[in-house]
Amino acid sequence: MQTLHVELGERSYPIYIGSGLLSRPELLSRHVAGRQVAVVTNETVAPLYLQTLLKSLEGFNVATVVLPDGEAFKNWETLQLIFDGLLTARHDRRTTVVALGGGVIGDMAGFAAACYQRGVDFIQVPTTLLSQVDSSVGGKTGINHPLGKNMVGAFYQPKAVLIDTASLDTLPARELSAGLAEVIKYGLICDEPFLGWLEANMAALRSLDQDALTYAIERSCAAKAQVVGADERESGVRATLNLGHTFGHAIETEQGYGVWLHGEAVAAGTVMALEMSHRLGWISVAERDRGVRLLQAAGLPIVPPRDMTPAQFLEHMAVDKKVLDGQLRLVLLKRLGEAVVTADYPREILDATLRSDYVALAQSFNS
């Protein structure tokens, strides 16, 4: 087992990474202050891992809340089901909420913990690659709004993150690829040597090789922990973690939450960010194509939805959380391994990026 730490003073917490960790009761119990635990999971994960987790929580007063699965349910109505479960079980301020599932479960359970009786402890137990390398670390919690993704939420740090890599054995290939979008992101924004490792090991990652997956998770979490420790509330460098997300969130919102997986939308958005960085003269054609090819090798879409117009992108991007004083800030690449957050770009470059022929770009890789 590998243990990393997110350093936030008195709110610092560990990230445990290894196989079989769901069956190690001491990893959970050391972070549960009271006797009450509320496990929040979904209909897909519950049959696979809920009983294993409950066995590790023997001796505690445990309530379970099983939610419908999918991004389409990341909303107020589903959030209320968590509060209903906590109140029905008479859970008090010393309860600990445990999020067992992917990013949707982690975001909603964390937000519920932040709100319930003005804040109770919670633990992240992510079961998808995307949640293991990204959403479970850093304290971002929340729900979607019909007008924008993740627009309602709070920064609220967990007491611990427990990553059982064995849970990836049951992850569908599409979900695995979606998680790889966030793994690739770390190489693009802050760790160029990692890109070379990913290129050499992509086949192993996609075939669920445990050693390769564990290494990728550890390296991704280490990068995320370092950034969060330096900028917890996204006032500076943490915003670079959103490479591809401004374009990607527009895709998710316009297409309907859950039609594109988050990682799929981020992948297409990352291609657009690479294209814009190239148009600004910051990265070469070869560097752009290297990033796009790696996303393609991960089994991810590299073409935005063909039915989305530039106007539709701009409409959704206008309510992005990185908009400040009416200016749309974007995460772009100065080079592979170095990202910036900037609103200092010619509008015509953004317009050209939105009009680019990504189908032709994709076809050029297959010719």
Swiss-Prot record:
Cofactor note: Binds 1 divalent metal cation per subunit. Can use either Co(2+) or Zn(2+).
Pfam families named among the record's database cross-references: DHQ_synthase (PF01761), DHQS_C (PF24621)
This enzyme's EC code(s): 4.2.3.4
Pathway(s) this gene product operates in, as recorded in its UniProt entry: Metabolic intermediate biosynthesis; chorismate biosynthesis; chorismate from D-erythrose 4-phosphate and phosphoenolpyruvate: step 2/7
Cofactor(s) required, per the database record: Co(2+); Zn(2+); NAD(+)
CDD domains recorded: DHQS
GO cellular component: cytoplasm
Similarity field: Belongs to the sugar phosphate cyclases superfamily. Dehydroquinate synthase family.
The protein's name: 3-dehydroquinate synthase
